[in-house]
Amino acid sequence: LVSGGEALYQIVLPPDPDPMEQQAADELETYLAKLSGTAELPKAAETPVTVEIGRAAQNDMLRERASADESGFFIEVRDETVRLAGTSPVATCYAVYDLLEQLGCRWFMPGEIGEAVPRLGQVQLQADSRVELPDFRGRILQSLPRGEASDLWALRNKLGGEVFPGAHSWNRLV
């Protein structure tokens, strides 16, 4: 994806991207630049890799395996194509963050001080094809303060889903 300080990829979004699909693309651009050690990546004259995000990357495997779950996502890296899609716009963000985690990015607490991004210089991906479904419908922290930084941190860590009110929610979980 990145070599010699240049981006070797082109991001493809649907013609009318959802705000979350656009956010997923923006976050991918931002963190690929950070991984490469630059503030902004110039595009190479030739961009051989296509990164399809959201509805631009939807496929039948994702629809079949994750039809009922709004948090499932699909990552496929094959030849010169990377496909990142979710069963919802939020799940599309989960796909991007999962890919970034594979590259070493971590978000330990809200805000820039809580992120850890290795400087790789060169960013390469291994062939991959998988569907991820959360083990729990509800992945929340009730003590997490509300606010833009906390909300973004929660999204980056794939928190969300159904909220189970109260401390005794076992009956709703099973």
Where are these regions (language model features)?
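Acidic, contiguous N-terminal accessory segments
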Residues: 1-74, 118-131
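Feature activates predominantly on carbohydrate-active enzymes
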Residues: 24-27, 31, 66-174
